[in-house]
Amino acid sequence: MNSAVDTICARATAVGIGAIAVVRISGPEAISIVSKCFSKSLSKVDSHTVHFGIFKSANGVALDEVLVTVFHHGKSFTGEESIEISCHGSPYVQQQILDALVITGCRMANPGEFTQRAFLNGKMDLSQAEAVADLIAAQSKKAHRIALNQLKGNLSSDLKVLREELISFASLIELELDFSEEDVEFADRSQLKDLVSKVLETVNKLSSSFALGNALKSGVPVAIVGAPNTGKSTLLNQLLGEDRAIVSDEAGTTRDVIEETLNIDGILFRLIDTAGIRETNQNIEAMGIERSQQKIKEASIVLCLADASDVNNLSETQTWSSKLTKTHPDKEIILLSNKSDLLKNDVEEGISLSAKEGIGIDALKSEMVKAVVGEMDLENDTIIANARHHEALIKTAEALEKANTGLHDGTTGDFIAMDIRQAMFHLGSITGDISTDDLLGNIFSKFCIGK
């Protein structure tokens, strides 16, 4: 497909005051339009060259000293003739440059239009285009790595292999349908069963990685829970390395939920210090406890904090932790025995620590990372972090399950072929091999303008 024939422009850097800013132009008239506002002609310069000069308004008034970088057709991010203007970071100067470009023949770009043109011009597939937005929004090392791997085409390569296998499968089934009257079987059913099972296993593996990918992308919610005065706020402060929560000997000091972020080994954790859970007659504290219960439901990891110096509290917390493990199998429940510095011997269950003295904090951090990553290799494994991709993989798996059932039940080839085509369609929707205008509009509208 070819992109729109007009030439677009927008800020490529964030709005606001800075040392420099970049204005991006892309389209068939990019070089011609900028040349009209620049102090020298750019029509014969080489691609990937940088030129210093004065940028002028449509009336010829000098606006700024700028650097202009030229990219020829087929050699730019969008695949089109493109220019990037590096100017001083004054919002006024940026706007004056944009105004001059619009008067001279540019149109202001829509959100994500530069990346959309890159997709339409075959510079990247749809999953790579979405990775651009994820790369910009990445808040941690691991989220950055997942987005970068996707941008490099790791996911695209995996899906290409799967689609090629399904195409090979479908072609044999379709060939049988063409010769149905001759009762010829081109495809060995046992081999087809093995192929579908193999593809289905890979699709399910990719799909199951979404929980990890989404957590790494959005931050892993961690609820710190326990009875009043067990040291939850002290633990939060120790993990953060600062006094964020009020610490007091008085039970019920924390009456609301406190949320902070913590980066451990490149993984972003969203720590939630909750109100101590106990029976209370005070309305404000009761509201805090109710919110604590809700945060437990929302968390991926629950840190159950016990006061190891209090035998009754330790026993109750151990029992409660075991119940949470059974009632919330989708969550990682970690039992923590706090105030271990007051004991002669370590507690056998859970992690022994002293939030006050910082003892056991490194062990806790390691356990939190292990709870998130498990056996996954974040550097090399393909991990799904996009909800649209996850939904498409689920639909792919459903279609393959139907095909697999049909093969085992002796279903006729036309129904099996239909299921395989559905699986291919959903896989293709991830990379954009199969897409609709509505889908593209929804995806690229979420990008920032200038990207």
Language-model segments: residues:
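Conserved G/P- and acidic residue-centered "switch" motifs that form tight phosphate/ATP-binding loops
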Residues: 122, 229, 273
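C-terminal-of-GTPase-core extension/linker across diverse P-loop GTPases
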Residues: 2-11, 15, 141-263, 280-282, ...
